[in-house]
UniProtKB/Swiss-Prot annotation:
A motif (Hepta-peptide GHRHDWE motif II) lies at residues 16-22. Coiled coil: none annotated. InterPro entries: NPP1. One of its GO terms (cellular component) is extracellular region. The lineage of its organism: Eukaryota, Sar, Stramenopiles, Oomycota, Peronosporales. It comes from Phytophthora capsici. Secreted effector that contributes moderately to virulence during infection by P.capsici. Causes only small yellow areas at 3 days after inoculation of host C.annuum leaves; these areas expand somewhat and became necrotic at 7 days after inoculation. Leads only to chlorotic areas, without necrosis at 7 days after non-host N.benthamiana leaves infection. Keywords: Secreted, Virulence. It is found in: Secreted. This is NLP effector protein 15.
Amino acid sequence: MYSWYFPKDSPSTGMGHRHDWEHAIVFIDNPDVPEPKILACSVSSHAGYKKYNPCPPWVIDGTSLKVRYKHGWPLNHDLDTTGDAGTFQDLIMWDQMTEDARRALNSVHFGSANTPFNDGNFKPKLEKAWPF
């Protein structure tokens, strides 16, 4: 699961809300091999998930999923896959975070947005996004 936090989700003047968490989930065949095969993917939106089984070949770059953050005018932004070239972002694993950071992500209230990868949400999000 790859997650992004946005302090504000406001695609049009006077609309939107504070705090937004979006995420993409990549389902692979075997996490123990150096280059696992991507089997499927799901991307979050306010209405749930867009699920791709299999992922379209143009949204895969080697072992990476290409994702874009787009506006769903007039109310929200969300994620979707893309064939467009992009940039790579640093990956920070849950276990790499300090105990204080994990505690904050487990306890801070983000209004109607919730941290998708914290202890209480990770498994339910995976289950809801399951594309098989």
